[in-house]
């Protein structure tokens, strides 16, 4: 179980408190009156900041062994993009949670490989998504459709740093 709260910053008073059936395992992203989080079952949730009620959720494929690496979420316009513990990158409509695109980055038939997968945080560079993993893969994806722009053989799961024309 995972408990989450809204607390008044000035008084410390709990405004509301809710429970999720599975522990959260991601960054938390906030936009407007909503916040987004992924649990250990690879389900992304959209909650209301006002009262903590679930607005929508979307379940991606899961594996019985849970990752310790925090999953990553980025927001771009009306899209929320995130990774799951088996290497899939998914883009959803931020308002209703409907699928826009999804791309696997691993051969999910080989479960032994996904057990040890560790992915960097996703980096939003305008129309690109940049990320890497510990399986010798460094990606640039097209944010609009999920297509692979390029893939390099670089072994790193540290968050990439993107400048105007260079990635570190």
Task: Walk through the language-model features, giving the residues of each.
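Short loop/turn segments that connect beta-strands within beta-propeller blades
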Residues: 8-12, 48-52, 94-97, 142-145
């Amino acid at each position: 179980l995972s408990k989450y709260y809204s607390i008044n910053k000035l008084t410390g008073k709990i405004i509301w408190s809710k429970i999720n059936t599975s522990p959260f395992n991601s960054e938390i992203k906030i936009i407007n009156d909503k916040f987004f989080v992924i649990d250990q079952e690879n389900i992304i949730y959209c909650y209301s900041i006002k009262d903590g009620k679930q607005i929508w959720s979307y379940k991606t494929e899961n594996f019985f062994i849970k990752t310790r690496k925090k999953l990553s979420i980025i927001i771009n316009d009306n899209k929320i993009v995130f990774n799951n513990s088996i290497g899939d990158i998914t883009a959803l409509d931020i308002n209703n949670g409907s699928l826009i695109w999804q791309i696997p980055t691993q051969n999910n038939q080989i479960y032994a490989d996904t057990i040890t997968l560790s992915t960097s945080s996703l980096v939003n560079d305008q129309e690109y998504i940049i990320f890497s993993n510990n399986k010798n893969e460094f990606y640039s994806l097209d944010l609009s459709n999920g297509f692979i722009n390029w893939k390099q053989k670089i072994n790193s799961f540290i968050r990439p740093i993107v400048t105007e024309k260079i990635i570190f």
